[in-house]
Amino acid sequence: MKDYLGISGKAAIVTGSGRGIGQGVAEALAEYGVRVMVCDINDENGEAVAAGIRAKGGTAEYCHCDIMQTEQINALIARTVEVFGTVDFLINNGGGGEAPRDFFDLDDARFDHYVRLNLYSAFAAIRAAFPYMRKQNSGRIVNISSGYALCGGEQCAHYASAKAGVIGLTTSIAREAAPFNINCNVIVVPTTDTPGLHEADGEFVDDELPLIPKGRIAKPLDIANAVLYLVRQLYTSDAADD
């Protein structure tokens, strides 16, 4: 296991880590010796990711969690503490969008659903994990937002609004957490090659590529490398960088 980031032996939760970005983050953390709690709503995917990490010599457990349900988030944090003794890193990756939808077709229930999935879930997980980080006077929280939070986009008002809220949540919590040596950061991810992207809109990638100077969309490993940078155990004052 690599250890030059100083994170070997730390305990991490990665929500939505059964595939895509979350899987990439979980596997990258494990490669550096972090003990990872894989969490997903799809048990087959989540168990497979955890098993894959263990097969490569890493430490990982799986916990089913619907991040829209407060009691399940609380149970996830409690299970992690039971298994690993604490929570050092919380990666709020779980969330998602849907196929493009005109804003005037959005009813209250659909808008609320995506706010709860993308924004409330991060808030609830931080609230549950924070006491453990505060007690040990250290912690790293990384929230995953989206480029749509900054520049918007047609037919995604509900998703963009929720992800913009994640940025506001992060900057506010970063100020409150800093006195306890807890960093809270947000990564504003670009279009990333994940199964969810292709399921939501199979033609989107082809339309997007000509607009990207490098000619490729991001890979989960690109996001994972950003997470590794933010959780490294070196002095940093970038408690609210994005």
Each predicted region: which residue ranges?
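Alpha-helical segment proximal to the catalytic Tyr-Lys
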Residues: 131, 175-179
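Residue(s) in the substrate-gating loop at a strand-loop-helix junction
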Residues: 146
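A conserved structural motif in NAD(P)-dependent oxidoreductases
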Residues: 212-223
